[in-house]
Structures are given as C-alpha cells and as structure tokens.
C-alpha cells in the first residue's frame, strides 16, 4: 500500500508546489499545505485520474488531509 501513499504525495507535491518533506500524512490540505478550494478540487480530479476512480462531491468534502486521501483510495481499491 506504500505505492498509493507515494503516488498521492507526488500528486500533492505537483499540484500544490510544496516540498515533499513538508507533506505529512496528518497534514490538512487547507490549514497545513495552503491549498484553497480550487486547489482541493484539482487534487480530487488528479486523484480520480491517477487511480481511475470517481469521487462524489460528498466524498470529496471528507477528503481534507493526506491520510484521509490515502485511506479513501485504499478502500476504493479494495472494492474493485
């Protein structure tokens, strides 16, 4: 499952232009990583594309930290 974590952190690094060493699992996209609402939408879209999944608006609202995105993707992959 480490591969999922690495892929998600790479997306965050690319989309938010943040040094990878600052991307911790408990980091909030908005509070800790400085993302705005548009950034979070772009992150969700990038996750959908990277992992070939659909994330509903309701689900997207709950994905507000690095760890929550990892957990969500892992759970989606288990259901495939």
UniProtKB/Swiss-Prot annotation:
Cytoplasm found in the keyword field: yes
InterPro entries: ACP, ACP-like_sf, PP-bd_ACP, Ppantetheine_attach_site
Residue ranges constituting the Carrier domain according to the UniProt record: 2-77
Pathway recorded for this protein: Lipid metabolism; fatty acid biosynthesis
Modified residues (O-(pantetheine 4'-phosphoryl)serine): 37
Biological classification of the source: Bacteria, Pseudomonadati, Pseudomonadota, Gammaproteobacteria, Enterobacterales
Name of the protein: Acyl carrier protein
Keywords, sorted A to Z: Cytoplasm, Fatty acid biosynthesis, Fatty acid metabolism, Lipid biosynthesis, Lipid metabolism, Phosphopantetheine, Phosphoprotein
Family: Belongs to the acyl carrier protein (ACP) family.
Any one of the GO CC terms: cytosol
Organism: Buchnera aphidicola subsp. Acyrthosiphon pisum (strain 5A)
Localization in the cell: Cytoplasm
Disulphide linkage map: none
Post-translation changes: 4'-phosphopantetheine is transferred from CoA to a specific serine of apo-ACP by AcpS. This modification is essential for activity because fatty acids are bound in thioester linkage to the sulfhydryl of the prosthetic group.
């Amino acid at each position: 499952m480490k591969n999922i974590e690495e892929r998600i952190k790479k997306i965050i690094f690319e989309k938010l232009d943040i040094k990878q060493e600052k991307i911790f699992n408990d980091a909030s996209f908005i509070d800790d990583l400085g993302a705005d609402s548009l950034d979070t939408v772009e992150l969700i879209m990038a996750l959908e594309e990277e992992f070939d999944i659909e994330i509903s608006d309701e689900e997207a609202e709950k994905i507000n930290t690095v760890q929550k995105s990892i957990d969500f993707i892992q759970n989606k992959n288990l259901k495939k």
